[in-house]
């Protein structure tokens, strides 16, 4: 009969820490490559089609605040555990978890607000009675043009005049682009939703890891001499925060 063997049972704390850090760096690298691929696709796509820019809603600003603040108790949790203060470390992890939940709620609320304004999808019925999902066109979005949103074509913002859209170079307003705006797939909305919810999914893994480590602290499996799991959790959590800061700037300010 085979027996389960803990290959790290006789390893020194230094070896365990290096191993967990290496594994976490591999995970972080994989996530970086995933989001780099998506944002690269966004840059290529933006230059080929009409592209909508939206101003940042209050919900997304709050999500940025929560994710940045959450790194503080996460850092303290690791530091306190190294100092042997288990209960204080557990408290800081609980605060991190609550801030992570707040981030997730505000992220979802931010996208829901954009979706309700027309950036999401519409559900219709097929002849067979099934639900058909259609991503909304650019013209479905509501708000004050030039303030709440604007649409670019070939890198230049369209001009709205008398309810019609025109290229910036069409100074005499002779060739309206309204029909194209009303029918063009809102690719920017689709990519924003993918980035938001993909980040939420990865952050949820960090939240689960937090709960596991809170329980490990509670039952005494983590200590000042065995903090490697919490250290790896901290690496992942800080990375998730940095990743959202990058995505926030990329989506709402850079592209």
PLM feature spans:
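...captures the hydrophobic TM-helix bundle architecture rather than a specific catalytic motif
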Residues: 1-255
């Amino acid at each position: 009969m085979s027996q389960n063997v803990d290959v790290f049972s006789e390893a020194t704390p230094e070896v365990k820490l290096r191993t967990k850090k290496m594994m976490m760096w591999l995970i972080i690298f994989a996530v970086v490559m995933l989001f780099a691929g998506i944002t690269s696709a966004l840059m290529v796509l933006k230059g080929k089609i009409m592209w909508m820019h939206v101003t940042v809603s209050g919900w997304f600003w709050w999500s940025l605040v929560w994710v940045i603040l959450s790194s503080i108790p996460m850092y303290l949790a690791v530091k306190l555990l190294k100092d042997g203060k288990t209960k204080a470390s557990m408290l800081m992890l609980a605060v991190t978890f609550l801030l992570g939940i707040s981030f997730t709620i505000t992220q979802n609320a931010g996208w829901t607000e954009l979706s309700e304004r027309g950036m999401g999808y519409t559900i219709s019925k097929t002849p067979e009675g099934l639900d058909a999902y259609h991503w909304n066109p650019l013209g479905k979005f509501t708000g004050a043009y030039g303030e709440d949103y604007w649409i670019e074509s070939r890198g230049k913002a369209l001009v709205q005049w008398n309810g019609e859209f025109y290229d910036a170079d069409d100074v005499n307003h002779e060739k309206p682009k309204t029909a194209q705006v009303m029918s063009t797939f809102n690719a920017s909305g689709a990519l924003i939703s993918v980035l938001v919810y993909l980040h939420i999914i990865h952050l949820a893994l960090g939240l689960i890891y937090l709960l596991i480590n809170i329980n490990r602290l509670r039952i005494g499996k983590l200590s000042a001499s065995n903090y490697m799991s919490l250290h790896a959790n901290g690496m992942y959590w800080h990375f998730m925060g940095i990743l959202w800061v990058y995505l926030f700037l990329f989506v709402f300010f850079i592209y």
